[in-house]
Amino acid sequence: MISIAFYKGKKVALFGLGKSGLATAQALISGGADVVAWDDNPSGVQAAHRENIPARNLQYENWSEFVALILAPGVPLTYPQPHWVVDKARQANIEIIGDIELFVRARNHFLQQYGFCDEDVPFIAITGTNGKSTTTALLAHLLEQMGYDVQMGGNIGTAILTLKPFVKKRIYVIECSSFQIDLAPSLQPTIGLLLNLTPDHIDRHGSFAHYVNAKKNLVTGASQAFISVDDAACQVLYRQLLHEGHHVEAVSKEHFVENGFYADGTQLFSVCQGRRHMLADLASMAALRGSHNAQNALMALATLQALKITDPHMNKHLASYQGLAHRMQQVRKMGSVLFINDSKATNAEASAPALAAFNNIFWIVGGQAKEAGIVSLRGFFHKIRKAYLIGAAAEEFAGVIGSSFPFSMSLTLENAVHEAAVDAMRCKAKEVVVLFSPACASYDQFKNYEVRGEAFISFVMQLKET
C-alpha cells in the first residue's frame, strides 16, 4: 500500500466506497488522516464498516471541519449535474480530488524527500477512448519480461494506492480514465500516452470538447508525450502541443511519420528525421492481431525507447503476451469456428478493431447503446455473415442493419450464443468467427462488461461438440 501522510491529523471526507474508494480510505487512515467516508449505496457503507473505516452520512457532517473531499471517479463532478457531495465541498471551498492525485502528490513528496529526479521512479500514464487497458497491460508485461520492477494499476482494475510503495527504479504503469484525470490537477507523468479520441462519456463531460480537454491534461503535463495522430482530435492536439514546445512525438498505425513511430502492416518502426528503424513484427502474434494492436505495441515500444530500455529479444517478449480478458479474447475453437469474447467493446469505436481483424463474422451485438449506435461500423458490414441482436439496442440496431445482412432478434446473450454457434458451424469457410463485440454498455442486462464477458464464456463452454 502507498500510505498518504500529508493529511495527517486533518479531517478528510471520502465519497465512493467501491474497491478503489476502500483502498483510498485505508491509505489515508494509515497515514494518520481523520477520514469520514460515505456512499449512496448501502453495500459500500457496509463494506467500510467491515474494514473498520469510519462511515457516516456526509450530508449531516460539519463541512467546515474538512480540508478535502476525495471523490470516486464514477461520481458526477459537473454533468449532468454535480452530485450533492460535490455541492457540499464547493460550498465549503475545499479541494475535490481523486486517488490518482493522491498518488501524484505522494510520489512528488518521495522524490523531494530523497533528492531523486522524475526518471528515478518513472510514472507512465496512459489514456485514450479505446485501447488503454491493452497498452497498459502490454507495457507492464514487457517490462516484467525484461526483469524490471513494475507496478500496474489505475483504471485497469487495480486501485492505484494498493500498489507497492515508492522505491528507486520502480516503474509505475497507470491507466487513467477521463474521470480520474478530472480529479488529478497535479498530474505530471514522466511519460504520457494518448491513444485516440472519439466521442464517449458525453453525458458526464457535457460535450466532446470538454472530454478532449480532460484527456489533454494528461499529455500536457507529461515530461515526454506520445500521441496517436490517426484521428482528427488527436492530430489537432499533437500540433498544438508541438507548437507550444512540449516534448511530444507522433505515433501512427496507418501512415509514415517523419519523427516518431508507425506501423506498416504488422511491422513496427521508429523514425528519426525520416530514417526508419524496425522494432518488431507482430505477424505471428495472435494476441496482438489487428491494426489497433499495432498501435498498442507502438505505444509500448515508444515508451521503452523513452526510458532508454532496449532488448534484443523484443519479438519474443511481445509474442509471450497473452492479451486481456474480454478484449478480443479467444475463448474456444470448435472445428474451424473461433469464439471471441470482446465484451470490453462498450462503444462502436471499440468494436471496430475486432470487426477489422476477422472475416466470416457471426456477430453478437447489442446492450445499452451509446450515442450514434453502430452507424460508424457500416464499413465492416460486408464482413458479417449474420448478426444476433441482444438487449435494449436490438430494435435500433435492426433499423441500422436493414437489408445489409441477415440478423436475428436473439434478445438475450444465451439465445444469441446458441443461434450463432449453430449457424457458424454450417459455414464452410476456412476460418469462421462467432464474435461477441457488443458495441454497447452492459447495464441493461449485466452489472458490467466483465460479468457480461464471463456469461458469454460460460455459454460458449457449455456448447456441445457436434
Curated annotation (Swiss-Prot):
Enzyme class of the recorded protein, top EC level: ligase
Pfam families to which the protein is assigned, alphabetical: Mur_ligase_M
Chief subcellular location: cytoplasm
Metal-binding listed as a keyword: no
Compartment(s) where it occurs, according to its Swiss-Prot or TrEMBL record: Cytoplasm
Key words, A-Z: ATP-binding, Cell cycle, Cell division, Cell shape, Cell wall biogenesis/degradation, Cytoplasm, Ligase, Nucleotide-binding, Peptidoglycan synthesis
Metabolic or biological pathway: Cell wall biogenesis; peptidoglycan biosynthesis
PANTHER family cross-referenced by the UniProt entry: UDP-N-ACETYLMURAMOYLALANINE--D-GLUTAMATE LIGASE
GO molecular function: ATP binding; tetrahydrofolylpolyglutamate synthase activity; UDP-N-acetylmuramoylalanine-D-glutamate ligase activity
Name of protein: UDP-N-acetylmuramoylalanine--D-glutamate ligase
GO process annotations (BP): cell division; cell wall organization; peptidoglycan biosynthetic process; regulation of cell shape
EC assignment: 6.3.2.9
Similarity remark: Belongs to the MurCDEF family.
Catalysed reaction equations from the record: UDP-N-acetyl-alpha-D-muramoyl-L-alanine + D-glutamate + ATP = UDP-N-acetyl-alpha-D-muramoyl-L-alanyl-D-glutamate + ADP + phosphate + H(+)
Cited function: Cell wall formation. Catalyzes the addition of glutamate to the nucleotide precursor UDP-N-acetylmuramoyl-L-alanine (UMA).
InterPro entries: Folylpolyglutamate_synth_CS, Mur-like_cat_sf, Mur_ligase_C_dom_sf, Mur_ligase_cen, MurD
GO CC annotation, single: cytoplasm
Amino acids binding ATP: 128-134
Gene name for this UniProt entry: murD
Taxonomic classification: Bacteria, Pseudomonadati, Pseudomonadota, Alphaproteobacteria, Hyphomicrobiales
